A protein has these predicted regions:
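Mid-length scaffold segments of soluble, non-membrane domains
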Residues: 80-159
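C-terminal motif of bacterial Sec signal peptides marking the signal peptidase cleavage site
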Residues: 22-24
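Bacterial N-terminal signal peptides that target proteins for export
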Residues: 2-15
Length: 272
């Protein structure tokens, strides 16, 4: 029987109190400017070229050799395997109920779901609800910082970039890679396989970009909006949405005047 170490009690209590206090901080407002746009566009072009040359063809090949059921089973496995990331961040966000529910989901799918390949937990009213360290930092009140595009990673921000090392420390895929040193970096193959499954799931949404004038702006704004909804559990306040969309300080009267002038010009007969 493991002996109880009473000397750690005060420190553990203090740590828990600090975490709950931090989690109660006001979320910093979203940022709408893009001070590093020149650099970001270069990185976006690099990532787009890498995607077209290697990543997308690999995802397409993966879809060709797997059935929808097989892909769903594989996605279930990776989602369950990475559940420790969500559970720990639930605790850091002072959400013990979410942590308990996601722990139950992890246990059910790891056992009844044969290692996570199947998802009986969803049928038991324990749906997948993921979170990460970037959301944790946001709920602690850390400002978003400038938008950033990272090579081979894509859209992120100065705040969200810290989720990569933090979440990797909680990710069994990261544990596997860090504990091995195989030839040709083969220890990273499971992580690469996970990324391929994510890219394959995005193939169906590619038609959304067909009519997009500036894909860089589309990805940037879509990323910021998605993160905002994740931070607020799908219900961001109207003020945060207005700031994100740049409509918080709009002069409605000025916009109406501009619209009126535009309509007048269109109504004037053309002069030859």
């Amino acid at each position: 029987m493991r002996s109880k170490n009473t000397s750690t009690g005060p420190r553990a209590g203090l740590l828990a109190a600090c975490l709950f206090a931090l989690a109660g901080c006001t979320v910093a407002p979203p940022r709408t400017d893009d001070p590093w746009e020149k650099f970001n566009r270069k990185m976006y072009a690099f990532n787009d070229a890498a995607d077209r040359a290697v990543i997308r063809p690999t995802a397409v090949a993966y879809r060709k050799v797997t059935s929808p059921n097989a892909r769903r089973v594989i996605s279930n496995f990776f989602a369950n395997l990475r559940m420790p990331i969500t559970i720990v961040n639930d605790l850091l966000q002072a959400e013990p109920k979410d942590a308990l529910r996601n722990t139950g989901r992890f246990v059910v799918n790891s056992t009844l779901g044969f290692g996570g390949f199947f998802d009986p937990a969803s049928a038991m009213r324990m749906p997948l609800q993921e979170t990460d360290f970037g959301v944790t930092l946001a709920r602690w009140g850390l400002p978003e910082g400038p938008y950033l595009v990272v090579p081979f990673v894509g859209s992120t921000s100065v705040r969200d970039i810290w989720r990569m090392p933090a979440d990797r420390a909680l990710d069994p895929l990261g544990w596997y890679a860090d504990s091995r040193d195989l030839k040709l970096h083969a220890e990273e193959l499971p992580s690469m396989m996970y990324l391929v499954t994510l890219r394959a799931r995005g193939l169906d949404a590619e038609n959304l970009l067909d009519g997009v004038y500036d894909p860089y702006v589309f990805y940037r704004d879509a990323y910021r909006q998605r993160r905002l909804y994740e931070i607020y559990d799908g219900q961001p306040p109207a003020e945060a949405i207005e700031v994100l969309q740049g409509t918080d300080d709009l002069d409605i009267d000025a916009l109406l005047d501009e619209q009126h002038e535009y309509e007048q010009k269109r109504a004037e007969p053309e002069k030859y």
